[in-house]
Regions:
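Glycine-rich phosphate/pyrophosphate-binding loop and the adjoining helix
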Residues: 75, 82-137
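Helix-loop-strand module that forms the ligand-binding subsite of alpha/beta enzymes
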Residues: 2-86
Length: 137
């Protein structure tokens, strides 16, 4: 826990990268937050270690992006699903700077070489968009 907290202290930008799992963050990420973002570290008396840091969410989904795109919109909107993390950012004094997402990268699609190549290309594109967003912060 101390090593994770030290990494967070040294960071200006915190990127939480995860697959969307049943419309939420994975349980291991939730557990990590519960164990690392502790009273006295991230919040509460003396708990200002995350204050002023930028929080960027980077997520992937197995379902295609259009599944998460509201009618009439051009892009998916994960804000309602990520409201808990957005609230956690505010509670800890972090600045929430957005969500980078890529859909259609399910493990179940990795059965043929063409499908795997398409998923790898999506992953590369996601990584580049993430780099661009971080560079702009």
């Amino acid at each position: 826990v101390a090593a994770e907290q030290d990494r967070l202290r040294r960071a200006d930008i915190v990127v939480l990268q995860f697959p969307l799992f049943w419309f939420n963050i994975p349980s291991l990420l939730q557990r990590w937050m519960e164990e690392v973002w502790t009273h006295g570290f991230s919040h509460g008396t003396g708990g200002d270690a995350l204050k002023g840091k930028k929080l960027l969410l980077s997520l992937t989904t197995g379902a295609p992006a259009q599944f998460f795109t509201p009618e009439g919109a051009d892009a998916p909107d994960f804000t309602p699903l990520m409201q808990g993390l957005i609230n956690a950012a505010g509670f800890t004094g972090m600045e929430f700077v957005g969500i980078e997402s890529t859909g259609g990268v399910s493990y179940s699609l990795r059965t043929e070489a063409e499908q795997l190549a398409a998923i790898e290309a999506k992953a590369d594109e996601h990584a580049q968009r993430l780099i661009d967003r971080i560079s702009a912060l």
